[in-house]
Amino acid sequence: MNKTIISVAALSCLAATMQAQKKAAAQRPNIVYIMCDDHAFQCISAYGHAIGKLAPTPNIDRIAERGMRFDKAFVENSLSTPSRACLMTGLYSHQNGQRQLGEGIDTSRTFFTELLQDAGYQTAIIGKWHMGCDPKGFDYYHIYNDQGQYWNPQYRGTDTPEGKYIVEEGYSTDLSTDHAIDFMNHRDKSKPFCLMLHHKAPHRNWQANIKYLGKYDNVNFPMPETFYDDYATRGEAVRTQKMSVTKHMRWEQDFKVPEMLDLNNEDSKDSYNALMGEINRMTPAQRSAWGRYYFPRNRKLLEANLKGKELDNWKYQAYIRDYMSVIASVAESVGRVLAYLDR
């Protein structure tokens, strides 16, 4: 009799504890933070820019419609890794140690995910980390090697043997989304969670998923008013940046025209080798599909022998079409995450 009472009492206490945990979790919202790398606001159709109207992103727009659209928000640092460091610490770059690429974040600083853990959250990060240290304040992580690769990226994390990097076949945006949904499926349901899904996309050099190659070939995107701006009257920072489509983007790697290789030019050879490194990562099927799109396009370019502003326009269209095709995968990923959360 006593044993039964004790057992019932224990079960009652356990049930009460579980109910209290569920109630507490319900009062603390789950957090899903999706971060892209070099994603211009003009390319999110919720902002009403001409580019967004021609290449709409309805899944991303749903977030703006359901919540808040930030029109006057600015990053503390516009570089990828330093920007993430500001996010993780809530501190300016000169305070968190990550002022530019190549520097390491001050890991003695508190990451906001550590505070969430203290508040009972289960935390996870998937995709791009690139901070020069192991993720801190995360119960689960599955991160790229370095800044990651678009095709068949390497991941390591709390679920890989001995923390070693493992190549996973597929497109990085899709794979990271798969892992994010898998985490949400298998998380501790008694706790609220914070999931950070960090994409490589749409970082340079804009390698689109095979299914989106050519998606915008029939779209003529308007060239920005500043396309030919030399920034002569602007500040030193903007004047000295290498951000011109016509002057600084490279034929081989950026425009994906390996036929332009100049064996007498070191920059051309470096650009070609960088592109070949990406192509050689692909499976035979991926490589074949890539070639079926780019090689005919490149032949037309070489035959046309464009000059002057016609060539400038070709470069801009090639760039922005690849860029928006990469964003198409990001928008698809957002849609998948929202569909999961809506279930």
Give the predicted meaning of each segment:
Residues 2-4, 9-13, 18-343:
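Formylglycine-dependent sulfatase
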